[in-house]
Amino acid sequence: MTITFLGTAAANAFPEAFCKCRNCIQARILGGPSLRKRSAALINNDLLIDLGPDIMAASQMQGCPLDDVRYCLQTHPHADHLDLSHLLSRSPSYGVVGAPILDFYASRETLELAAETFERDLAGYSLLSSEAEKHLNLKIHQIQPLESFTVGPYSVMAFPANHAPGMGAMLYAIEAAGCSVFYGTDTAPLFDQTWQTFRQQKMRFDVVILDHTYGPEQPGTDHLSAHQVIEHANRMRSEGLVGSHARVFATHIAHEGNPAHPDLAEFAKQHGYQVAYDGLVLKV
């Protein structure tokens, strides 16, 4: 399994466009891994996690084509994770040739909100209609939390995120070819039910990717902080949910308390995890 980080920032990217805080200034000076687009990830070349606003820029900048994407797991409908205008580029009216069918997976709440937005702002028809399926070469799949389902060659289980009440936000455990990854953003501390299900299902992850919106100087609120990431990683190790060679990565990184990449990476190293950056490719 190959995991490509298309973006690793929180909602407003990093540095933030109009911000002159120390962290944003330093990120602009250093460039490189300190410059972050909004979070999304690609597994192998066919499974996208989040149809985010920056995926096209990431694809072009990283030389990572998306034309073989067959599946999309949508975490939730917030604008930094879901840009429905990308779906219009699947329409014949845009001259698109050869796009494979896209199987799109999301919770009922996410799909209902997306359908309303799509019809109101973009196309004049519902994303859940047969018209959308025909024009966009799209198949919609409604998923439930704590249920397993098959996505092409992948076995997936969705978990309820501790985030955005009423929007059906999801986290995902994904397994293929003997490799297992947990993609855990956006979320505040994981629910007890999630931990219980990890144990009941005897899950054991090779890679864990966690929300790291707030840095070492900030408390976690609606998202995880650096110290909460450390706590989650340590708990996973103590409960045997990760192997001895498993890796834990931070993503969804905001300027609030998170320094530019070199300093944040050094902090993470001292505490047993790593910091993802845009364009990072993991071989699992």
Features from the language model and the residues they span:
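Core dinuclear metal-dependent hydrolase active-site scaffold
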Residues: 1-64, 139-196, 280-284
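Active-site metal-binding motif and surrounding structural segment of the metallo-beta-lactamase
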Residues: 46, 52-105, 206-208
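Active-site neighborhood of phospho(di)ester-bond hydrolases with catalytic His/Asp-centered motifs
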Residues: 48-52, 69-80, 105-107, 182-187, ...
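Short, well-ordered amphipathic alpha-helices
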Residues: 56-60, 85-92, 114-122, 227-237
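Alpha-helix termini
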Residues: 63-64, 90-99, 121-131, 200-203, ...
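Residue-level recognition of the N-termini of beta-strands and the immediately preceding loop/turn
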Residues: 69-70, 100-103, 133-138, 205-206, ...
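Metallo-beta-lactamase
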Residues: 98-101, 107-168, 273-278, 282
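Cap/insert and terminal regions of metallo-dependent hydrolase folds
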Residues: 188-283
